[in-house]
Amino acid sequence: MIPKIIHYCWLSNDPVPDVFDKYIKGWHEKLPDYEFIKWDFSKFDINESEWVREAFQNKKYAFACDYIRLYAVYSYGGIYMDMDIEVIKSFNTLIDKPYMFAYEGKKNQGIEAGCFGTDKNNEFIGKCLDYYKGRTFIKNDGSFDMRPLPQIMQEIYNKNGYNYQIYSHEYFTAKSFNSGIVNITPNTYTVHHFAGSWKSDAEKDRIKRLQYLSKKYGWFGKNYAELKSAHEDYGIDGIIELLKSKIERKVVRRK
């Protein structure tokens, strides 16, 4: 059984944004019988992990929290939530199992790392923690290792052949990263609003533009925005790679 503990992380010295405060108040309203643990400087020694220390020193707090969320859930059990998570209803109908995971996207690609839970010392979460052992956030070429945690978790899950029941996108995400459209169903427990604090301002602007075009022009707008972003980043090579990836995904789905 998953303990009734909610873990969340805030490492910045900046004030917590009002919108996050609003979500956290909602957590307490919807989950009155849960314990809440805030992970900050007083709770976690950033020098315990080279990854966390380097990410923190470079103000990439979301990546420092990638390790801390795994550490918190592994050490205590419970549920981790990003601060941009809106709780729709209590988890009480899910926590009788030893874990709760859902996919981040509708195509069952990437495990949602913004909301997940397990009992204490969960093997899968332990292996995710092992991924960071001896790993540095600053790569040999001086760039940052900004690989998203959902991809890391999915890779480790697949590599080890786990057979967990993983819920669909509608359970803990319920929002399109590309379009920004929220789709709450009877199965929805939380909505992940994708604040994307780790993204640059330019990346955030591109996401907003893509979401606007998707909402206004649907499929055409979404694909136009993706092509435009690929061209801005990598020129004609970016467009070619984007089209190749779309074709490959269609081939895989047809098999």
Name each region found by the language model.
Residues 1-65, 83-255:
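Glycosyltransferase-associated regions of secretory-pathway enzymes
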Residues 67-78:
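Small-residue hinge/turn detector
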